[in-house]
Swiss-Prot record:
Binding site for Zn(2+): H174, H178, C223
Residue numbers binding FAD: 12, 18-21, 104-107, 148-151, 156, 194, 201
Keywords for the protein's UniProt record, in alphabetical order: Cytoplasm, FAD, Flavoprotein, Metal-binding, Oxidoreductase, Phosphoprotein, Zinc
UniProt GO MF annotations: chloride ion binding; dihydronicotinamide riboside quinone reductase activity; electron transfer activity; FAD binding; melatonin binding; oxidoreductase activity, acting on other nitrogenous compounds as donors; protein homodimerization activity; resveratrol binding
Other noteworthy facts: Uses dihydronicotinamide riboside (NRH) rather than NAD(P)H as an electron donor.
Protein name: Ribosyldihydronicotinamide dehydrogenase [quinone]
Source species of the chain: Mus musculus
């Protein structure tokens, strides 16, 4: 949709990977719609994933005992976070939609993407207490997880060996994105890359491109325990 801004937070080491292809499809399709698309390619940026004292410029508010959450909150208010954090926060603030593109690692995100979430979505910028979930500071924005798995779709069902995929998405979609106020769209999961044929991969890419054509018309999922755990 013309005028919309999209941030793609991309976490894969190899540009020629299937994740790279999914990212490329998203950039091309959304650009065709007139969207402004920005990509944070975390590996090529050498993005620092560690949450440390070095994220704060100047003296800490408590020089005796360091608390990352407290210190980054204070630093955000004083504009004393490092430039790489502020730059990513600027991208998020400007975006109408944030797409996270990554391979599933141990039922979660790669460490570099976890570090992005830890450092960028700090208190004061993304949330406060009170000021979370539906009152989170990123309310009004959309977020979407686009991920790939080695295992097949059958493995990630309620009766499958890995359990329903909704279970492992709970911490990411509800505990992180919804907590910060995002409206969360249904995930785009490309299953079974370890066993998929070239033709099957082409179908996955085409399906992603087709979905993106109407992405702005989608309704967000219900970020509640019943949706995730089928209560």
């Amino acid at each position: 949709m013309a005028g919309k801004k999209v941030l793609i937070v991309y976490a894969h080491q190899e540009p020629k990977s299937f994740n790279g292809s999914l990212k490329k499809v998203a950039v091309e399709e959304l650009s065709k719609q007139g969207c402004t698309v920005t990509v944070s390619d975390l590996y090529s940026m050498n993005f620092e994933p560690r949450a440390t004292r070095n994220d704060i410029t100047g003296a800490p508010s408590n020089p005796d005992v360091f608390s990352y959450g407290i210190e980054t909150h204070e630093a955000y208010k004083k504009k004393a976070l490092t430039s790489d954090i502020f730059e990513e926060q600027r991208k998020v603030q400007e975006a109408d939609l944030v797409i996270f593109q990554f391979p599933l690692y141990w039922f979660s995100v790669p460490a570099i993407l976890k570090g992005w979430m830890d450092r960028v979505l700090c208190r004061g910028f993304a949330f406060d207490i009170p000021g979370f979930y539906d009152s989170g500071f990123l309310k009004g924005k959309l977020a979407l997880l686009s991920l790939t798995t080695g295992g097949t779709a059958e493995m990630y069902t309620k009766d499958g060996v890995s359990g329903d995929f909704r279970y492992f998405l709970w911490p990411l979609q509800h505990g992180t994105l919804h907590f910060c106020g995002f409206k969360v769209l249904a995930p785009q999961i490309s299953f079974g890359l370890d066993v998929s044929s070239e033709e099957e991969r082409k179908v996955m890419l085409a399906s992603w491109a087709q979905r993106l054509k109407s992405i702005w018309k989608e309704e967000p999922i219900h970020c509640t325990p019943p949706w995730y755990f089928q209560e």
